[in-house]
Amino acid sequence: MFDERLARIARGHSRDMATRRFFSHTNPDGEDATARGKRAEFTCRKPISTSSYREGLGENLYQDNLYSRIHFSGTERSYDWNSSDKLAANSLRAWMNSPGHRHNILDKVYSQTGIGIAISNDDKVFITQMFC
């Protein structure tokens, strides 16, 4: 189920990556997904059996460009822009072809998700998907 709080945390991480020019589950301040969630007063605790639980957020990251190709003709340049549908399809394909990312998407313990997208000044697209 979509969760707006997770989406806000995900957007914040995507914006942070776009602004500070990094691509990682851990930001330059040393915060991982769970720490960023706690800073936003969001904790995730899921039972995995009658006597144990799992605490923490899951996270998938994806980076792409706004364009798929640049054409140069003399001093002119033009772009083949990626549509939002194309960017969504690219991210999902990449995640589903990666065992760890695929596991996050299909893990039945997670019941909430949020996605955040940011675009950097140099046309990079950062997508963060978070799970609880």
Language-model regions: role of each:
Residues 22-24:
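Conserved "HGTGT" condensation-loop signature of ketosynthase/thiolase-family condensing enzymes
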Residues 1-18, 28-36:
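Acidic helix-start/capping segments at beta-turn-to-alpha-helix junctions
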Residues 33-122:
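A well-ordered secondary-structure block
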Residues 14, 20, 58-59, 102, ...:
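Generic secondary-structure boundary/loop-capping signal
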Residues 1-2, 26, 46, 114:
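A generic structural-conservation signal
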Residues 122-132:
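Short, low-complexity, Pro/Ser/Thr/Gly-rich segments in the mature regions of secreted, periplasmic
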